Amino acid sequence: MNVTPEVKSRGMKFAEEQLLKHGWTQGKGLGRKENGITQALRVTLKQDTHGVGHDPAKEFTNHWWNELFNKTAANLVVETGQDGVQIRSLSKETTRYNHPKPNLLYQKFVKMATLTSGGEKPNKDLESCSDDDNQGSKSPKILTDEMLLQACEGRTAHKAARLGITMKAKLARLEAQEQAFLARLKGQDPGAPQLQSESKPPKKKKKKRRQKEEEEATASERNDADEKHPEHAEQNIRKSKKKKRRHQEGKVSDEREGTTKGNEKEDAAGTSGLGELNSREQTNQSLRKGKKKKRWHHEEEKMGVLEEGGKGKEAAGSVRTEEVESRAYADPCSRRKKRQQQEEEDLNLEDRGEETVLGGGTREAESRACSDGRSRKSKKKRQQHQEEEDILDVRDEKDGGAREAESRAHTGSSSRGKRKRQQHPKKERAGVSTVQKAKKKQKKRD
């Protein structure tokens, strides 16, 4: 038969190695006399419903009849006498111990006396017990310090005193403190000098007391004055309320200023470049608005002059209209040139502003956002300028065609010239209406 070797766990191997180091060999028991266990304890899993310590094989190993026979045989005693052999069984009473049951009457209460018609009869047992207790419970003697020193042969807990180092000064100081304390309790002045053990009250408490006293004094004075003059009392109440409000507002403003100052210090370096650009943009916008207003005024004045010329006399008006038409024909060219120059200047200013932001600005994200907004605005403005220029170009072309037709027909007949002169102010009025519409659109966009 092949015996399978035992599979040892890591813990068992480690324990065997430690025991082998100390001279243990397999088969020996543990302990100094080597009479201990020879095999290691092993943990077994409990996979049944029986209690701890239950032996399921006890039914087959327990021979109860054998035990019963042995017990009865042990109780039998065989005695041999003159009469013969006698068998006697031991009584059960001898094997038991007599334990008297406690009296459950008056378990937690003590019977002091019994009531009768004649009176109370005290319990004698209790009296005897109380006498014994009084005799036995004598108060022990209280030893004095001198008696303790004699009993301990002059030895104390202070070991240095054995060498002659005593604490006479400290003991004297403690005695003086005790005497002063006792005198203070009795209300007498101590004869011995007191140590300055009590700490002086702090100055803060004194200040608070003074402030409270002053406030109470002022309050009492106000009450007296209020009783005498109730009108002044109402005024004082209003003033005090106003002062409180101002004080609270001042606190709130100080807190806000503190927070804003901290934020301003942090953002000062980054917003310096942006502030300069904003100021420049504002100045540029104001200049542009002024220039636009001047242009519109000039155009309205010129259109009004043309209308007045058409309404005047026909003979003198023919010469004036030709002069005005020649001027108006020259004006669009000059206007275009001026607008182109202004747009170029605006673009140059915007390019410079963007360069300064990119060069000196500390916060790139903010500068980019600002530049994007400006580029959008500039694009919108350019589109508006282009639309206005297109409108003016159309007008100028119409005016130019009308002028050529008028110049050709002026030599032919005066009637044709009159009709054209009557039609010309209508066209001018239509141009004025378109200009006004463009103005309204710009205002709505702004």
From Swiss-Prot:
Keyword presence, Signal: no
Record's signal peptide: none
Descriptive protein name: G patch domain-containing protein 4
Pfam families recorded: G-patch
Modification type N-acetylmethionine: residues: 1
Protein origin, superkingdom: Eukaryota
SMART domains assigned to the protein according to its UniProt record, in alphabetical order: G_patch (SM00443)
Sites bearing Phosphothreonine, chain numbering: 4, 116
